[in-house]
Amino acid sequence: MLVSPDGLTKLLLKNGAGLALFILHFIFLAVEQDKFNYKDIYLRKIDINKRSIMGDLKHKQAFICDMDGVIYHGNHLLDGAGDFVNWLNSNNKNFLFLTNSSERTPRELSEKLKRLGVDVEESHFYTSALATADFLSLQKPGCSAYVIGEAGLMNALYNAGISMNNVDPDYVVMGETRNYSYEQIERAALLVQKGANLIGTNPDTTGPTEKGMVPATGSLISPIEMAAGVKAYFVGKPNPIMMRRAVRRLGCRSRHTVIIGDRMDTDIVAGIEAELDTVLVLSGVTSMDMVKKFAYRPKYIYSGLAEMLKTM
């Protein structure tokens, strides 16, 4: 027969029993008396964890956020995106939208968000096109390139002092494009065979749209790699070069910065390797089942920005 809590306390003090034994015995006593609810204890533990997560994210100084699959799908703003930007501004957080897409300029991205009802200045955007231009201008100032891509890439390279050259360029640079021809593939492959270095703005093989997944730079550059017999160098996420520049732009230390993304193979691994806290949202290309296939894990997982904001 179990003794009462008071009797047990006196007995333990008298005999010098350990604290662990006291706690264990007390739990067994409470269970017998139907006064101990394991479900309540479990729920309290979850609530404590949620408050801990809220504290971690709420007090970060800087936020790096992907766009496709996090902020929008095509021309559809995702739940919580506008509220998230409002929260960043009202709490004076440093933030940067870091996208592997090279199609649009920062101005075009700002205008797109404005059309969707979210006001963000151009200075808050850093694209793989800008990262590629920065990389090439540091590697070989005044270099030239044969470029396959859209306005975002062309403008970034031009503004970095890189000239266009389709005869004997230093680099062949490939980004996302919707105007892709066999003649471009052929010329690019021949130029690489003659000595031009092959650069890709990002390694993504697919990108999300309202219609579904479509080929991205990693897929588009593949025929050139195969024909020229070389592997491209990719500047965008998860390349540490792009991550270091992003953190430097924010002016914060890694431990005070968090990255939010929808791709395990770019956003999350980039954050882990840069020693940032990582948030995976399941509003883009990654499902919970897919997460299990990777050797690494994000620190936090949410269905989307709307759910994340509930903890902040």
Language-model regions: role of each:
Residues 2-9, 17-26:
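Intrinsically disordered, low-complexity segments enriched in serine/proline and basic residues
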Residues 14-15, 45-46:
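Polybasic, lysine-rich low-complexity intrinsically disordered segments
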Residues 28, 49-65, 70-79, 83-93, ...:
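Asp-based, Mg2+/Mn2+-dependent phosphohydrolase catalytic module
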Residues 35-41:
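Compositionally biased, low-complexity peptide segments typical
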Residues 101:
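Conserved phosphate/oxyanion-binding catalytic-loop motifs
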